[in-house]
Amino acid sequence: MNYNQTLEFLFSSLVSYQEKGPEAYKPGLERITAFCKHLGNPQRNYFTIHVAGTNGKGSVSHMLASVLQQAGYRTGLYTSPHLRDFRERILVDGEMIPKQKVVNFVDKHYDCMKELGLSFFEMSTALAFDYFDQSDVEVAVIETGLGGRLDATNLIIPIVSVITNIGLDHMALLGDTLPKIAAEKAGIIKKSIPVVIGEKSD
């Protein structure tokens, strides 16, 4: 398959939030944990910064990646969703993952993805982890997809966690009050790992 055929295949065979909405949400780390073990746990081979929040997490992630790159670090950036091209989600030093890398990853691991029942986001996350490792990234900025505690990205052990703000969003999935939503996003906080909070409410 070529790149476009691969994407069409993935969108038609793996459940995606963009296509199905809330029914595509598959909380839990069991599937991504098993798949990353299958890959050799590539996410353990470089430093990571984890970013969550209701608003601003994409902008903060891009700014952090830019600063790190300018400081001389080989930098990965994983965000979602994309605007025009799926590859916008996965950048190394500002360059999108090559199309052939996406095709090769799917060709090699699709049977395992289907067996585990991965969602499209879980596949994308694992692809990013693997590509960053292959690209000898020194530090990767990883943006959560939805929430934090049960988000597929929460497999990482970051050097710092960032929570930009908390608002009433995805209430059907994360909870119907700010404290409930905050608890989900605070799930990216790890013991003995620094946390930066971007906004405080009175």
Predicted regions mapped to residue ranges:
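Buried hydrophobic positions in well-ordered alpha/beta secondary-structure cores of metabolic enzymes
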Residues: 51-54, 58, 125, 141, ...
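ATP-dependent carboxylate-amine ligase catalytic core
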Residues: 22-29, 33-44, 70-156, 172-175, ...
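A short, flexible beta-alpha/helix-coil linker loop
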Residues: 16-17, 167-169
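Internal gly/pro-rich beta-alpha loop/helix module
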Residues: 159-160, 172-202
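Short functional linear segments
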Residues: 1-53, 60, 66-71
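Fold-independent oxyanion-binding glycine-rich loops
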Residues: 79-81, 143-146, 165-166, 184-185, ...
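Inter-motif core of Ras-like GTPase G domains
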Residues: 154-165
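Hydrophobic/aromatic beta-strand patches that form the interior of the parallel beta-sheet core
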Residues: 49, 76-78, 160-162, 196
